[in-house]
Amino acid sequence: MEFSLLLLLAFLAGLLLLLFRGHPKAHGRLPPGPPPLPVLGNLLQMDRKGLLRSFLRLREKYGDVFTVYLGSRPVVVLCGTDAIREALVDQAEAFSGRGKIAVVDPIFQGYGVFFANGEHWRALRRFSLATMRDFGMGKRSVEERIQEEARCLVEELRKSKGALLDNTLLFHSVTSNIICSIVFGKRFDYKDPVFLRLLDLFFQSFSLISSFSSQVFELFPGFLKHFPGTHRQIYRNLQEINTFIGQTVEKHRATLDPSNPRDFIDVYLLRMEKDKSDPSSEFHHRNLILTVLTLFFAGTETTSTTLRYGFLLMLKYPHVTERVQKEIEQVIGSHRPPALDDRAKMPYTDAVIHEIQRLGDLVPFGAPHMVTKDTQFRGYVIPKNTEVFPVLSSALHDPRYFETPNTFNPGHFLDADGALKRNEGFMPFSLGKRICLGEGIARTELFLFFTTILQNFSIASPVPPEDIDLTPRESGVGNVPPSYQIRFLAR
């Protein structure tokens, strides 16, 4: 939908609703921000290039903590490393609530481990962390699963014989198979039609959720939901994925062996059975479906997109690629696969992966938080249930913590001796009590897939390095890298 039409619809909505609701009311003692219009909120301050651009521009005038009105609802925006850490770490409990993402709210409605709140969320998060940890130990470790998948990926890339290809589908396949092995107890063949359909739905949905239309929908969901738009396609896509998950759950239920749980779904079904007499239990069918959807979506999209962006950066900066491959040769060699223990001996490669995550800036303004009580913060009072947007991008590009914030520079994560150093501005997985629960798995995947590929292949592009464009194809809730062609040449 064109911006002008969206603006017209929003303006008409404002005129109609103004007759019934009047001006936005004052809320506590919120941080300063641009004065909102009735119902329209700060629509006129929103940049056509999206919410991130809008927030960064408003930051220049109002500072690191300010309030914007998305429609009639106030949202507190946090910018910069220090403000985000003060909120999510120093006052972790107060800022531990989860806000809504309007385009997916009709699906989740506050259920599942990502969108749940209060004790429901705590119980689901504890369970999810413990279950993934248990399936990362015992039987087959997560590391072994990733190494197996990396071997399959190398075999598939060898089949290309150095021809140009788009790595999107392959990277989606390998990262998805890791979470599939933990959640569903199986991996899929890369040509499996059901698997390919699921991957297409995830890729479509991530791109649509990150689109400009979805950002406009965030301002006026109650009104725009009555019109055609990306929100309807997102709903259909996620419903189709949920149908697949539901069918898989029923197959698990029919073959469940209580003495030998095979995967996350089995363990959850056993917990459901244990709690079936408790009507207040969080462990019910709907939370199972939506928690699996969350794990599947996050476990597929975020890591695969980081890998895609990473190899685009390696094409643009071939001298970095050469240095990574030299470190791989020195530490690992060519006769065994990379292992997680190698990471501690490979500070340059680890720094490169950190810098890929930093500059890739996958989730620019993070997932929405919500304060769980009236909260004093930097001299203001944020009322209970107010949404909070931590702009992670502003930390990942914070000039106080990164010397060249807009340039690819692995030195941001290396000390004078070449050892890996911690950087307070690095928060791609967010911080605090809502930090990504798959952080450990994602970091392991990034290291093992990245090093295995560069151990076995040189890479080349039909485009000269200086002409490679890093501009995201979509930039909203997520940054979607541009499509590109790459050759994987066996070493």
From Swiss-Prot:
Functional summary from the UniProt entry: Cytochromes P450 are a group of heme-thiolate monooxygenases. In liver microsomes, this enzyme is involved in an NADPH-dependent electron transport pathway. It oxidizes a variety of structurally unrelated compounds, including steroids, fatty acids, and xenobiotics.
Keyword terms: Endoplasmic reticulum, Heme, Iron, Membrane, Metal-binding, Microsome, Monooxygenase, Oxidoreductase, Phosphoprotein
Subcellular location: Endoplasmic reticulum membrane; Microsome membrane
Membrane topology note: Peripheral membrane protein
Family, similarity comment: Belongs to the cytochrome P450 family.
Provenance organism: Oryctolagus cuniculus (Rabbit)
Pfam families in the cross-refs: p450
Top-level taxon in the UniProt lineage: Eukaryota
UniProt cross-references to InterPro entries, sorted A to Z: Cyt_P450 (IPR001128), Cyt_P450_CS (IPR017972), Cyt_P450_E_grp-I (IPR002401), Cyt_P450_E_grp-I_CYP2B-like (IPR008068), Cyt_P450_sf (IPR036396), Cytochrome_P450_fam2 (IPR050182)
Membrane in keyword set: yes
Keyword set includes Endoplasmic reticulum: yes
Primary subcellular site in the record, as a coarse category: endoplasmic reticulum
GO biological process: epoxygenase P450 pathway; xenobiotic metabolic process
Cofactor(s) needed: heme
Protein known as: Cytochrome P450 2B5
Annotated positions of the Phosphoserine modification: S128
